Amino acid sequence: MKKVIVYSQEGCSYCSELKNLLEQNGVPFTVTDIDEKKSDWEVISESSGVEYVPQVLMVDTNDESGRILAPDRDFDEVSECLQHIMTDLQE
C-alpha cells in the first residue's frame, strides 16, 4: 500500500488545486504544512532539489521506500502530478 503526503503552504493556489483534485478522485492523503514542519520540509526539498510547493511524497508502507514528485522536475501542471500519483497507486 502507498501513502500520499502533500507538502503544502498556506496561500499556495497550486497546493489547493492539487488537494482538491486528490479529494475529487478519492485519493487518501495527508498534508504537511512546510511552515509548521520545517525540518521535514528541509529533508524533502534537499532530496528533490526543488525549494517550492506542492511536492508529493509517495511512501510504500510495505518497505518504507519513497518517491518525491516535485514541480518543474516531475510535472509542469498540477493535473500532471495527479496522473503520476494515480499511476503510482495502481502499481
Regions found by a protein language model. Give the residues of each.
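Local sequence-structure signature of Cys/Sec-based thiol-disulfide redox active-site neighborhoods
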Residues: 1-28
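Short beta->alpha junction loops/turns
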Residues: 11, 34-37, 74
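General small-molecule cofactor/ligand-binding pocket signal
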Residues: 30-32
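Non-catalytic, surface beta->alpha helical segment in thiol-disulfide oxidoreductase systems
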Residues: 58-91
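Thioredoxin-like thiol-disulfide oxidoreductase module
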Residues: 34-52, 62, 84-89
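Noncatalytic linker/hinge segments flanking ATPase motor cores
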Residues: 14, 46-51, 71-78
